[in-house]
Amino acid sequence: GIVGHVKGSSTAVGREAGFRAGLGEAGTQAAEIVFCDSDSDKAYEQTKDLLKKYPSMDLIVGLNEYSAVGAARAVKALGKTDQIRMGSIDSSMEQIQYLEAGIYEALVVQKPFNMGYLSVETAVDVTRGRKTETSIDSGSELITKENMYTQENQKLLFPVTK
């Protein structure tokens, strides 16, 4: 199952397409997608409903923090953490705790420093009349329980701010 955030948003559309493509043929057969409007309580209820409708479901992905957290809370509340493999996009403290506990198998974590840097760099290029790309990939990292404490991944999961 897929728990998305805002139906029709470019991030929801792109993330769903990428998830399905990554699964190949199995992705075309994924149960269904629900949208929680970035409300973790709604995602919780929707995930419980999905699991009632599809009792043999064994994979759920949350396409943003709120959808993923609500889905994980539901899976945990229903005692199905051993039955259902979960993945998530983003990296709130609650998501990191679920990864550490083995509820999520992986987090896809964005690189916010790159986002900011490349945004400013592109804005400067535009003001100087330079041709720029219409889409810029700032990168992401697949974080698992096994690699979450490497030095580079710690910087993504636990950024030091002033």
Regions found by a protein language model. Give the residues of each.
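Hydrophobic alpha-helical segments within soluble ligand-binding/sensing domains
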Residues: 13-14, 20-21, 42-44, 92-95, ...
